């Protein structure tokens, strides 16, 4: 049996399964590419990279139903708590140990408002996570543009797998994501945050060819619902 199973749920949502189940950015019910319903997900932990609707997603509903631990930047955690669901805040540079899963919050270049009831609430700063789970290190970049300290993330945490956005417009596009792979130097990269909507339509095969022409990193392209086992 694999030590770790990583399933792409479309957009930036992933389910990581080892001794515990970690759900990242559960944008499910409004995601046209989602391979499941929120009711089918029973995580031990949810990690939220930022407050935008396509990342906060179904966090509150899943948290209320399962009682799982929810981790996010301080301001997003406060918003979740205002809805009657317990959440735990952290900030960039910090690490939390969740009894077998570690989350280290990293920089991301993006924004993080929370839009609800016709108003925008302060969502703090966007973030990524370096995740320690099942004996492996995984970097989920969140929504981000490229930044030079991705190299430092690679040097400090040596992630085996990087989950990187390639959709452009709101995040890195293919050109920038290829350079990010060069900076991070993971063994495997999985593209995400593309083709959910026409406005972020990209051909992941173009990304694969560009990466493989530059570095030895293996590109794994998943369809929503497909998994990697390590």
From Swiss-Prot:
Give start-end ranges for the coiled-coil region(s).
none
Query: Is the Hydrolase keyword given for this protein?
Result: yes
Fetch the InterPro entries from UniProt: Metallo-B-lactamas, RibonucZ/Hydroxyglut_hydro, UPF0173, UPF0173_UPF0282_UlaG_hydrolase
Which GO molecular function annotation, any one, does this entry have?
Answer: hydrolase activity
Q: Does the keyword section mention Hydrolase?
A: yes
Quote any Pfam family the record assigns.
Lactamase_B_2
User: Keywords in UniProt for this one?
Assistant: Hydrolase
Q: Which family does it belong to?
A: Belongs to the UPF0173 family.
Identify the NCBIfam families for this entry. PRK00685.1 (NF001911)
Q: What is this protein called?
A: UPF0173 metal-dependent hydrolase MA_1308
Native organism? Methanosarcina acetivorans (strain ATCC 35395 / DSM 2834 / JCM 12185 / C2A)
């Amino acid at each position: 049996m694999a030590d770790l199973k990583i399933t792409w749920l479309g957009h930036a949502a992933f389910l990581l399964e080892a001794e515990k189940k970690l759900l990242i950015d559960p944008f499910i019910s409004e995601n046209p590419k989602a391979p499941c319903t929120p009711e089918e997900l029973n995580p031990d932990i949810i990690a939220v990279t930022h407050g935008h609707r396509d990342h906060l997603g179904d966090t509150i509903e899943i948290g209320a139903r399962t009682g799982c631990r929810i981790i996010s930047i301080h301001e997003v955690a406060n918003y979740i708590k205002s809805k009657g669901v317990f959440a735990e805040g952290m900030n960039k540079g910090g690490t939390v140990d969740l009894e077998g899963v570690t989350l280290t919050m990293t920089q991301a270049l993006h924004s993080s408002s929370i839009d609800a009831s016709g108003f925008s609430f302060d969502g703090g700063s966007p973030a990524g996570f370096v995740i320690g789970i099942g004996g492996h290190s995984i970097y989920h970049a969140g929504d981000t543009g490229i930044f030079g300290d991705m190299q430092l993330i690679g040097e400090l945490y040596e992630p085996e797998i990087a989950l990187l956005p390639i959709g452009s417009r709101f995040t890195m596009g293919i050109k920038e994501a290829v350079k990010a792979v060069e900076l991070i130097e993971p063994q495997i990269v999985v593209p995400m945050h593309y083709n959910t909507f026409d406005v972020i339509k990209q051909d992941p095969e173009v990304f694969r060819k560009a990466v493989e022409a530059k570095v030895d990193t293996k590109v794994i392209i998943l369809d929503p619902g497909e998994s990697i086992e390590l």
